[in-house]
Amino acid sequence: MINIIECDDYEVAKNLVLDYSKIKGAEACFVSLDKELSDLEGFYKGGALLLGYENEKPIATIAIKKINDDMAEAKRLYIKPEYRGKGYARHMLDAMLDKCRELKYKEVRFTTKPEVMSIGYALYKKIGFEELENNDGTVLMRMMLTL
């Protein structure tokens, strides 16, 4: 079972994001990685950084970045490979959406690369994210939230 909490250890979060950044083909998702990692707390101010634990071991992350008072961007959904296939990504997404509602966001956006992250892309569509645009294989998706 996964236990999801707001980040209380930025070094743990940094290591998970670094693991995620090594996924082959996902390099374009990390253009501002150095800036992000140098101040995770500041980078996600007005949003949140959530960590997922199994048996007290950090295994997952997802972040919420404030765009404006009504809109946030979900970022950095990552489950360590050995923990995939257990439904944890869905739990992380649900926790992220709950936190967005708590923060009073009306819209959440997500950018993904379906050819690299096909399972995640299918899950986003399954839970209600809609595709807004596709630029050379990078897809912008959104979900409108009810508070």
Question: What annotation goes with each model-predicted range?
Answer:
Residues 79, 85-98, 122, 126:
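Conserved acetyl-CoA-binding loop-helix of GNAT-fold acetyltransferases
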Residues 4-75, 80, 93-94, 99, ...:
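Acetyl-CoA-dependent GNAT
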Residues 28-31, 35, 83, 87, ...:
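Residues at secondary-structure transition points
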Residues 80-81, 105:
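Short amphipathic alpha-helical segments at helix-loop
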Residues 69-70, 85, 116, 137:
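Surface-exposed, flexible loop/turn segments at secondary-structure boundaries
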Residues 104-147:
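C-terminal "cap" of GNAT-fold acetyltransferases
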